[in-house]
Every structure is written in structure tokens, then in C-alpha cells.
Amino acid sequence: MIAGGETMKRGLRAQAFLPLIVFLLTTTSCTTEKKAERAAPPEQVKASVNWEKVVTLSKTTPTLQVVVNPPLRRGHLTRPLAPSKIHDPVFKALHDLGADFVRYVPWLPYPKLGVAELEPPANGKTSWDFSLIDPMTEDFINATSGHSVVLNFSTIPQWMFKTQKPVPYPADPDQVTWDYEQGTEFRDPSLKEVADYYARLVSWYTKGGFVDEYGHRHESGHHYKIAWWEVLNEVESEHRMTPQTYTRVYDAIVQAVHAVDPQIKFVGMALASEPPDYFEYFLNHQNHKPGIPIDMISYHFYAVPTPDQTQETMQYTYWDQAERFLAVVDYIQAIRSRLSPETQTDTDELGSISGDDLEQDKPGHVTKPIPDSYWTLCGALYAYLYSELAKRGVEVAGESQLVGYPTQYPSVSMVDWNTGQPNARFWVLKLLHDNFGPGDKLVEARVDTPYVYAQAFVTTQGQRKLLLVNKRDRAFEVTIPDSQGSEIRYVDQTTNFQPPGEARLNGNQLTLSGFEVAVVNLSR
């Protein structure tokens, strides 16, 4: 999760980027023959596939995260504003995507939308209140019905931490605050208080309600099936937990939640960075209470250029940082294989952030326009990461995030925050989801330039497909042997806010425009 204020400054060690203001001059035909209309001729490259050489079997699900924020509300309950214009189209897009392992995160900038007990129990009374939390949660669960989800109520009630004075929060649920999370020491060192809080949350959504601290029953009527529960978020930044502290908190919460629903599986850590000591400590079963499962771990990656980079150099930075991240993934997978090989991996925040977003907490900041080419670049980066994570045996590749908007990381959004229309980042995810998934065979593919990425798949239905990703803001003409007449689905700067385009190859060449992602179906 991308944090703000003091938390933002801590959480953006590797989460900064300048917006791409590169207006691409490529257009691509959506007719039967796909062409690039550039002044300069495209570079000629060749792709080859060895269908007999299987590299690995994919375990990887392409998916996304949904972060709670006001535009996702059905309407504004506390002040006379019009209902959200994007609520319906956004949840429809989520429903139509049909992805598994979708991550849902109520989090710190909006305490009233993410914390169910904002005040400590006192004098026989509690402050439990789901009236603002339930509508979005219900809409999310309905939109993802029939699919596995990962719930993460990531923000612990602030009063559970020792602070010099109580930490305030806005009366307006739509008012952002970056200062809610403070303190590093729990007021209850036994951790029973925080564990009971999460047990009651789970009981609210799975058992129809719960009994509070004073023995009073609170009825919800909810009996949802929750497949996965992620325990907190970016804990090395939020409350600055050590691996030892987090492991104790994880164990306490897992034990309490399992008492409510023994079928729930758990995701641990959700790290913003990749500190080796966290993985070494947390994945060692000897550091956990007996019987505590480590079903899955999670961590995040956001591409980050330095502030002084020019617009032209940013496209190179993205891919360089992705390569470094993948090297870290290899290292983490080696630790996991050594200490807890049964544990799965969820990279549940994969994204990129513009440099302008880093200024959003400053008074009077106005979000700069984001060019369409930025969304296609981000989509291409995600497609590349998905494929490479599949090679490495990572189970979940989650794109971040469904809705961002001014004050809440607009450059990370997968939709237009004014209309709810999905952008190229969403449509690339849709393209991958509709063509690839767990059980596919990854087979050897090559292309004679480092600037175009190729990976071949034999799907579970036996179809032969080639994923192509253009890493550069220029066109390449890719020769693919025996591809004449093949169907193509693609996302580029001409499709951008529309569903993937469709075409058919008239010959063995495909012109790949700047930052384009294409899937060529070579099954005939």
C-alpha cells in the first residue's frame, strides 16, 4: 500500500516517479491487417519459439488490488454530495474481469472507512460501527462472487498503541489524513487486544456478528466465505515493526481468526521493500507458535525513477528497475524454498507512481495531466512482470490499484477517476487474464533484440500463444514464422481506454507500436 505524510515519506523509499509526458506518434489499425503509421520505418526483429522445450508450468494468477477510498462509495452519507459517478462502472469492470485472488484493503488515510472500532471500550460502551465500512465491502464481495479474494483490514485502531496523547481523525469520512498511524508499542503487550479485534472483524463478515468486549451481541447478517486473510500491510513502515514483533502479531491474529473460521488461509508480511531479515525470520517455522500456518507471503514493487531524469530516459528506468526486482524475487524464492517450500507467494502490489504524486500531500497541490502513453507504459511493465513471475513460480501477480485519484495516487489508477472507464493498465490485465493462467506451459521463445519481450505459452486448452511486449517508445516489425492468419489481441495507445483491439496477421510480420502488449494466437 502506498502511504502518505510521515508514513508516505517512509513508505516511498522505492516508490517515486516522474510522470511520462511522452506523446507517442504511433497509430495502429484495428482492421484485418495491423500496421504502424510512423514517419520512420520500424526496426526489423525476428521471434522464434521452440514448442518442444517447456521452461516451466505456470502457477501464476494475474489479478489486482482494490483500495478503499471515497470514489468507491455508493454515495456520501455524511454530507449532501451527489453519489459517486464511478461506483457502478468500476464495480462492473471488476465483476466482468472475473479474477481470483483480488486483494481488498481498507487502509489508513480514511479511518472511518477502514477502522471498525475507532475509540477504546470504556464505561460499558464500545464504538463498533460498520455503517460506513459495510457498503463498499458488500459491493466488493458481490462483484467478486464466485472467486477467491484476499481481505486485509490493514489499519489497527490507533488507540491500541502507546502514544503521548490520543491521535485524532477527521469527522468527515471522506477527508484524507496521513497521520493516523502512530506509535510502535502496543498498549497490551500480550497482543490479545489486537487479536480479538481481528477475530471480531472476521466474525462480523463470516458468522453473522460477534460479542463485544462487554458481552453485547452485534448482529451483521453476513455469512460470507473468506478464502484468504492478509495480516496487516507494509509493517516495516507502518508502526515500524521488527520481524520479531510482526511474527508475534501475525501468530496472535492467526490463532484468534482460526478460532472463528478454521478454513481461512493467511497471507503474511505484505512488505513494501524486501529486507532479507524479514524473510529469513518469518519463513522459519521455529519462530512461530506450534501449529501456526504460513500459507502465503506477500511483498510489493513500484517502479521509481530519480527526480532528475528526463522524460526520454524514464522508459529505460522502468525496465532496469524491473530487472533488479526480479533478481530480488529469485533471492526471496530461494529463502522460501529452503525454509518453507509449501508457502506460496503473492506479489500483491505491482505498479508505478509518478513523481507528481509525491507532491500530493503539499498544500495547494494540483495534479498534473497524465498522458495516455503513461498508462500503456505501465501496462507493458505489468505484462512483463506477470510473465517473468510465472517463470519463477510466483502464485499471484497483483496489479496496483483499481482506483486512484487526486490526493490518492492518481498515477496508480487503473481507471479514469472521473468516469470509471478502465485505462490501458486495466485492459492489459484483462488481456492476460483472458489468455493465460495457472496450468499453462511456458515454452522457450526468443527475439533478437532486448527491447521486445517474447514468451510463448501452451494453455491448458492446448492453444499456442505468444506474448509480446514492446519495452520502447518506437515501433518494431516482428517476424514470427508460420504466423500468417493468426489472431491478435492487443493493447496500445490507440486502444488505451477501450477494450483490447483485435486483428489478424496478413503475413508473418506484426508491427508492434510503442509500449504495445500483444497476444498472438498461433493455434490453427
Predicted regions mapped to residue ranges:
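Short, Lys/Arg-enriched N-terminal segments with co-localized hydrophobic residues
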Residues: 1-7
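Bacterial N-terminal signal peptides
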Residues: 17-27
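Non-catalytic accessory regions flanking glycosidase/transglycosidase catalytic cores in CAZymes
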Residues: 30-231, 237-238, 242-275, 288-293, ...
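Catalytic-core regions of glycoside hydrolase
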Residues: 260, 279-296, 324-339
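Glycoside hydrolase catalytic-domain groove-lining segments
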Residues: 304-361
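Histidine/acidic-residue-rich catalytic or RNA/ligand-binding cores of hydrolases
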Residues: 356-362, 409-414
